[in-house]
Amino acid sequence: EQVIEAPKKEIPKKVTVVMDERALLFDFDKSVVKEQYVPILRNVIDYMVANNYDVTIVGHTDSKGSESYNEKLSMRRAVSVKEKLLELGLSPDRIVGLEARGELEPVASNETEEGRAQNRRIEFNLVRRD
């Protein structure tokens, strides 16, 4: 009798979790994490713990306002998400960085309100622990 083993699924070392346009967005000029996003953040925590990941939280803005202001705003957004993740029970040592990208990496056009709304976001860069 021949036994064939299924190949083990490789867990990637680095993963960027980019939310879709309905997820983890911010109101104009705000850094408050809306309560409606708590279930998404719980899912991120569960995924990180189950797959042994640490996270860098990356904040983004739309292009309204000065570049320097938007950089600061994107950092406030990253800090706000960090605080919410800690409040929800994520171990502080799993948060390995906060980054402010400001308006420099849009995912949609800043020419429309809908596009600007999609750019006011958070991304999670996950790195597996060794």
Regions found by a protein language model. Give the residues of each.
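Periplasmic peptidoglycan-binding/tethering modules of Gram-negative envelope proteins
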Residues: 1-55, 91, 128-130
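Periplasmic OmpA-like peptidoglycan-binding domain that tethers envelope proteins to the cell wall
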Residues: 31-34, 38, 60-130
